[in-house]
């Protein structure tokens, strides 16, 4: 009975895991392909460089990430060494915190 219950619980968790994986993949591609600049520790990077850095942090924090929001919070919002926030600077716009920018895109993605 316990085995069946555990199997059922794990099967129910699969769609959520798949959704999270798809959302994270979308956000990484969004950063990678953007015309916006990724500002980390005061230095300006391309979206591709930003995505590479976020991916490295994602790999490091993978065991602690249970949701896409965890991914954003742990991998894409601030430096773990300096505590400095990451920012996004899009052409013709004011810079915004990367976490807010990514949460906004996540909301759009989920609405599709």
Task: Tell where the protein language model's regions lie, with residue ranges.
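N-terminal secretory signal peptides
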Residues: 18-57
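Sec-dependent N-terminal signal peptides
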Residues: 4-14
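Compact alpha-helical subdomains of small soluble proteins
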Residues: 42-112
